[in-house]
Amino acid sequence: MLGLRTHGLDRYEHYIRRPSDFGKLELQDWLNHKSFRVSPNLLIDSSTTREWNEPELFYQNTEDETWVRPCVGPKLEPSMMMLRYHDSNIGQMPQFCYPISSPINFKPVLKYILQERSELSDGFPQKYNTLIGSLFDIDKNPETLDDSDIEALDDIEMSSDSGNVKEPKIELQALEEIQQKHFSLIVSNNGIFQTGSTSITYIQSGISGSIAIKPNNVAILILLTQPSGHLLSILPLDDGKETYLLQYWNLGQKGQWNIIKHQNEKQFVLIHKELGICKFFEFHLPFTFQLVNNLTLTDSVIMNGSFFPTNYTDLDPYFIIFITAIRYERIVYFVIEWNNNEIKKKEVYQLTVFDGEKTNMTIPIGLNACLVETPLKFSLVSANQIMSGETEFHSFQLKALKGIKSFFPAPLLLLKLQELHPHTFKKFQYCTIISSSTGNICFCVTERSTIVNGNLKFYELTRFKGLKSISPLPSNPINLDSRSSSYVLVVISFSRTLELTLSLEDLRCLDKKDVIKPLKNITFKHTIDSSTEENSQILAFTSSKFYNTHTGSNINDTRNSQVWLTSPNAITQPCIDYKLRKTHQLIHLKQFQIFRHLRIWKCKNLDIALLQRLGINQSNTESSLIFATDAVSNNRIFLLDLTMTTTIDNDDPVQGLINIEDLLCDTENETILLNFTKNNLIQVTRDTIYIDPIGGDKELRKISPGWEFENVTYNDGILIVWNAGLGCVSYIENIDAVDESGALVSNLSSSKGMSKFFKQLGTVTSVNFQIKESTDDPTKYDIWILLPDCVIRTPFSDWISDSLDFSDVYILSVQQALINGPYFCSLDYESYFEVHTLQNNCFKKGSRCTSRVNFQGKDIKFRSFGVNQCLAFSAFEIFVINLTPIHDSRELDFYKLKLPHLGNNNSILEVCPDIENNQLFILYSDGLRILELSYLTSNNGNFLLKSTRSKNKKFLYLDKINRMLVLNQDLREWECIRLSDGKAVGLDSQLLKDDSEEILEIKELPIATEDNPLEKKTVLLISFTSSLKLVLLTAAKNKISNQIIDSYKLDNSRLLNHLVITPRGEIFFLDYKVMGTDNEMSFNKLKVTKHCIDQEERNNTTLRLTLETRFTFKSWSTVKTFTVVGDNIIATTNMGEKLYLIKDFSSSSDESRRVYPLEMYPDSKVQKIIPLNECCFVVAAYCGNRNDLDSRLIFYSLPTIKVGLNNETGSLPDEYGNGRVDDIFEVDFPEGFQFGTMALYDVLHGERHVNRYSEGIRSENDEAEVALRQRRNLLLFWRNHSSTPKPSLRRAATIVYEDHVSSRYFEDISSILGSTAMRTKRLSPYNAVALDKPIQDISYDPAVQTLYVLMADQTIHKFGKDRLPCQDEYEPRWNSGYLVSRRSIVKSDLICEVGLWNLSDNCKNTV
């Protein structure tokens, strides 16, 4: 590999096997405090095989000063719920979609790149490192482009080793002749992936900018910029399945870097807008770029930049860049020009636009011309105008184009327009398609003289909701056909990527106020990918309603646990631990609802004689031959042509479906086999074998052995029928060779080997035979006999010679089995799917692989689905399982089909795959449906909402009616969405609009109501600015009504935007009012009670809100959020740095109520608190000042809390090595303070907030008094024994020294909530999980005891319950089983490095 190193390694790096900043201790602390327990990165045993993010933990034995590995984990309290990491669903927020072309045979390309790298390495000078290092140390004028240090690199003599024998050189011209494959690639916020695929190339540090560039005629590269300040060059191959990093470059500055490229695809520029930096790059080799020089605009902020289109030729190659910037609070236009012959010599022109506006976007639209968008207008700017100092530009307004989002040049569209409408478009030479933030898509056409005559036209294409970006499809056949009146492009709308086919017949030229109608000119839209929304909330719940057709969020879920993500645009149900493949229904044939079994043949695969008999003259027809039977007495055969078929609502015959009446031999008896050979039709009923010659004068032959067939199997002319109960087996060696007398039918019932076999079976009647080609000789066949407890293989040659030997036995317990090529697929008796590989006609040792999907309680059937896939289906589900394991593991990958919602009783009877056309023929109870397989996705459901521009929405799942309630706070509207199909029902919004106060929150109350069997009632609580409303929701007769039951008003105070409803139906809320510099805040507890309206009629009751408990306090700060665990309130302030506990809120009086600060990690800020049960809760915390982690999950348990002075403070359960620290804290005792006379003080304020204790309470039992007395004694102790006391932090403050109290934890050591801050022994968390991305939201499903964590990049982590045994030998897993991201291959101490790194999942490389 080739690299430029900027600095040396850390001095202790050679001690580290795989260095990391994660959890690194300060080196000086490590040297000074030798008794530190944890050294996760500095002391890793080099002989281990652990991953870098699975450090071994060591501690130092103080006796002999040796480091040893701990073998015993700490005992955990029984009340501590442990949640372990289970799985993740990587988020994929699409940003851009690029058309990609790459060679089908890409191995020569990789060899060429290695050859290019080898040539670079051979010619790399030794002085290069020193020169580059000195280059970055020189302080230069940032606006000087003549960089002499970079030019000096050309003067260095390149030395190479001429003695090496090199392989034959691969020429680039040979690679250009390789056939190309075209696909679309999506760049998300954290990775790249092919459209319709769930396999993502994960970019660990994120993506801030991207562009597709083609510096050669072989393959397209993707250039990515990262927020960390790195430029990556990515080569996607094999439909995006293979992704390679070719080169990275350290840009020297973090932040947002934008990429612009020239039309020749070899020159590109990186722009850092905030810092005003431009970096100029060039592909000097087909797959390698280099930095040419830099430009820094001092005291400037760059707004936009783009290349001017130029007449680029090899004889006169020149480049012009247009940049708009703010410099000294003025709008400045820059033009940078250079010639390719003198690439480092650039000329800079600038023009100050005194009355200019900030630019939103600059778009190259013609020769040396750019379209500049400002908030009020559009301007046409040319390079010549800026160079000559002109300040008057052609300006205009255009409403449809306001807020430009993306654009691309469209030469293929211009060719179509010139062919379809020559009189209008013949004079134009340039065409650009532009999209706006309002969803409008239009195109601009210009001519060479547009700058002079101002002749540019804008024409409408369409308008599409939620538009984020657009991209071309240059390889699409419709776009390549200039005579076609349609044009296809790709759009990203919300989280979906679609192909839109647009009609070019009726195009309207846009005026400045014209509005484009939604979906205008769209003739066909096709979704090719469904990814992730920018969700803000995650909801996890278990629905009491279970539907057979519903797909849950977890694969083996039997309790209908669901996860939903919410955003202002949509609600989405993700699949956490599996993938889905969407399907598209082509047709529904109701005529087939009387049948129970199907068999499908593609007519193009049948013999020509049979096609002629069917009346088909074309051998390449796409028609299908369908055999259907009701398994009793009705046998039919149909010919279906999908190109002529239309779906109708009634049961009349459908055009394109033909009933063939004279093809079957028997239409009245149950048929168990129908097949075709080259010469014959074979039909087998329960007692007869029919052989019907397709052509010629031969007559129909019947074979009836005289006993009933239990089943039949057939393969390539070999047919076997059997009845295990009767002990009868017969076979036909070659069915085409059977004569009229049936002499070639062999009966093995009297065979000595077969007779012995049936005797050994005893009462076992479940026997199945399968005929398969031999794995070592394809001309031979084996007969596999499947029994409940074993599998037997016999060569078919032994059947012919009557020398059967059943010694080749494999002990295997199976429920179902299928042999698909070299794979033996089975369902074991634990209902797991497993595969054994066949090698040399036997089971390959150690080849057993399984899938994680469990089919327990489901009647599963297997079907072959190609060479390497198996299809497994039940009454309501279809799975496709890959038979090759994932990488080097023993796990089989699979996906589930997303089937149409057809009701809870419409079951699947049969599935017949059409692999060539990617279709499935599925026989449902209501008929035959033909589905086309579409894209893979991680979303089970994605339903768009109304009013997507309204960002303030609340979401609530209502279990009783199985609906998602969506409350639009901005428009004061609400609706209910059925989660099975997304159908929305609007609710009466009058009660929301009658109240002018702001809507804050909505919750459901777990209250049982007297339900009418025909009605379902739900009680809701809605909080406004200063009131609460109790609302009854009633669902009946497909309508949902609502009414206000009761309301609760607050006087002179406002509610916090947070409500807590406990499982017992208790209501907790917080209100506050501002009093000078303080906030008077109150925690309130309400309960819902029943009141009789009429005392005589006891049944006539209503619900009322009643205040039960109220706790008022004063605070400098505001409570940010809180939750209730049992009867304890957990709260945090607006800064989120501290966490507080109010114990026994309901059972304590104001005088005895305590507020305790809980221990938090000093670098963490609370984001959200949620209870896990009556004892435990979890805190989502943000770690903003750390480089090694971004967030934490911190777990607390309330039953372990013991109140008292902390003389033995244990360290936090952190793998980062927090030790004991002796420090001070300060307390201001208020004037007139008397020990034992007051229970609650705000020691920071020195103000009294509650009344004195009653006289009946003895002071010696006062917990606060005991604590304060101990503090006073401790104060005297330190005054007598401390020779050098620490200075006071504030005047008039009494300094209190307390052992083992760190100011990092409690800076002011007082409760902001207004009570005496009590230091406790067990207020620290019992577990913490470090995460490498910021947390967006968390949600807990108590029914299945599972925690779901939504990260900022939309990745979802799943943590499941794992109650740990209290045994000494138990060793807990590090970080609860969650492994942080792998170490990046990008080295922070290198300026650049070129190579060939495979970024596929199995290679474990990441950037």
From Swiss-Prot:
Its recorded name reads: E3 ubiquitin-protein ligase linker protein MMS1
**Region (Required for interaction with MMS22): which ranges?**
1-600
How it assembles, according to the record, is: Component of multiple cullin-RING ligases (CRLs) composed of 4 subunits: the RING protein HRT1, the cullin RTT101, a linker protein MMS1, and one of many alternative substrate receptors belonging to a protein family described as DCAF (DDB1- and CUL4-associated factor). Component of a RTT101(MMS1-MMS22) complex with the substrate receptor MMS22. This complex further interacts with RTT107 and CTF4 to form RTT101-MMS1-MMS22-RTT107 and RTT101-MMS1-MMS22-CTF4 complexes respectively. Component of a RTT101(MSS1-CRT10) complex with the substrate receptor CRT10.
Superkingdom of this protein's organism: Eukaryota
Query: Is Cytoplasm there in the keyword field?
Result: no
Per the record, GO CC terms?
A: Cul8-RING ubiquitin ligase complex; nucleus
From the broadest rank down, the organism's phylogenetic lineage runs: Eukaryota, Fungi, Dikarya, Ascomycota, Saccharomycotina
Q: What is its main location?
A: nucleus
In this chain, where does the modification Phosphothreonine occur? T1294
Tell me which UniProt keywords the record has, alphabetically: Cell cycle, Cell division, DNA damage, DNA repair, Nucleus, Phosphoprotein
Q: Which GO terms describe its biological process?
A: cell division; heterochromatin formation; nonfunctional rRNA decay; nucleosome assembly; recombinational repair; regulation of DNA replication; replication fork processing; transposable element silencing
Report the function annotation for this chain. Answer: Component of multiple cullin-RING-based E3 ubiquitin-protein ligase complexes (CRLs), which mediate the ubiquitination of target proteins. The CRL associates with CDC34 as the E2 ubiquitin-conjugating enzyme. The functional specificity of the CRL depends on the type of the associated substrate receptor protein. RTT101(MMS1-MMS22) promotes fork progression through damaged DNA or natural pause sites by stabilizing replication proteins like the replication fork-pausing complex (FPC) and leading-strand polymerase at stalled replication forks.
User: Which gene produces this protein?
Assistant: MMS1
Q: Where in the cell is it found?
A: Nucleus
